[in-house]
Regions:
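A generic secondary-structure signal for well-formed alpha-helical elements
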Residues: 56, 63, 91-94, 135, ...
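Conserved nucleotide- and phosphate/pyrophosphate-binding catalytic cores
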Residues: 11, 146, 152-319
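Short helix-capping/linker segments at secondary-structure and domain boundaries
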Residues: 91-97, 132-139, 240-248, 278
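Short, flexible loop/turn elements at secondary-structure junctions
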Residues: 1-3, 75, 184, 200
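N-terminal Rossmann-like or analogous alpha/beta NTP/dinucleotide-binding catalytic cores
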Residues: 3-128, 278, 282
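Internal, conserved structured core segments that host functional sites
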Residues: 100-104, 109-158, 181
Length: 319
């Protein structure tokens, strides 16, 4: 996960909820991808360190357990970059140029100069991030599938060129997660300025919820609503008690409750729902020494594995 901004509810109920489940079943490595943040934010990286520690606080507050998973910062394990260099020597340029994510982001992020090797080649760094721990499964969304396939191709090519099965071919691990849209109905994203952040105060949450888009076909309170297509209702299903959700659904369909009242109810439940997370955030914010120890422990664990993999790869190459 790249530290390019604060984490929001979409992150909490998407990647973090999934990672929390996975750490109970697998040996997991979770790292803050601060080098990857530089692919798009290289002109001003002053915020990367701040967001890195904010991200780690949110991860721990969301339930990632340093006793069950290895949690660390990418740039503190320099073996990633050395393996990336080895991979960059064998990766054909057309493999990178046909990457659909590369093409899409070039179109979307028009305000940034992305004509750099770092941006074109970041999937090679991703491959190093994955293969240096000899990962067999990688939790990803559908949009990341091309990157996993490229990682497999790089591993296959490396093994073929140096006639040794150094790296496994990882498989994607897809998971269904609740789709929480931003307050404007688009994908929740810091880039769209439509996110509800895990660090938002109750006052800010109330203000953002009051701005949320609702059922466009419901123009008046007396009009029957359609909860199944209302963004507010999708949040209710996560943060409001089930019996209340059922009542809201019925009242909305029968025009017994208006959108303003519905949003006020959601805001109160959402504030209470993320309160435990925010209390844990406050704990780590005020116990910086403990946070640092957790991360340093994860860095040492990761580096032991990464160093062994790198040495094996270098031996296969003959350097």
């Amino acid at each position: 996960m790249r530290p390019t901004g604060k984490l929001h509810l979409g992150n909490l109920h998407g990647a973090l909820a999934n990672w929390k489940r996975l750490q109970e079943q697998y040996e997991c490595y979770f790292f803050v991808a601060d080098w990857h943040a530089l692919t798009s934010d290289y002109q001003d990286a002053s915020h990367v360190q701040e967001y890195t520690w904010e991200m780690l606080i949110d991860w721990l507050s969301a339930g990632l357990d340093p006793e069950k998973a290895t949690i660390f910062i990418q740039s503190k394990v320099p073996e990633h970059t050395e393996l990336h260099l080895l991979f960059s020597m064998i990766t054909p340029l057309p493999w990178l140029e046909r990457n659909p994510t590369y093409k899409e982001q070039r179109k979307e992020l028009i305000e940034k100069d992305l004509n750099t090797y770092g941006f074109l080649g970041y999937p090679v760094l991703q491959a190093a991030d994955i293969l240096i721990y000899k990962a067999h499964l990688v939790p990803v969304g559908v949009d990341q599938l091309p990157h996993i396939e490229l990682t497999r191709e790089i591993a296959r090519r490396f093994n073929y060129l140096y006639k040794k099965e150094v790296f496994p071919l990882p498989e994607p691990l897809l998971a269904e997660v609740p789709k929480l849209l931003g307050i404007d109905g688009r994908k929740m994203s810091k880039s769209y300025h439509n996110a509800i952040y895990l660090s938002d105060s109750p006052e800010v949450i109330k203000e953002k919820v009051s701005q949320m888009f609702t059922d466009k076909s419901r123009l008046r309170k007396s009009d029957p609503g359609h909860p199944d297509i209302c963004n507010v209702f999708s949040f209710h299903k996560i943060y409001t008690p089930a019996e209340t959700v059922a009542q809201i659904e019925e009242d909305c369909k029968n025009a017994k409750i208006g959108c303003v009242e519905c949003k006020k109810c959601l805001a109160e439940n959402l504030i209470q729902g993320i309160l435990p997370h925010q209390e844990r955030r406050h704990y780590y914010e005020t116990h910086a020494g403990e946070l640092k120890e957790i991360v340093e422990f994860g860095i040492k664990k990761a580096q032991m594995v990464a160093r062994a993999s790198l040495e094996e790869a270098k031996a296969a190459v003959g350097i």
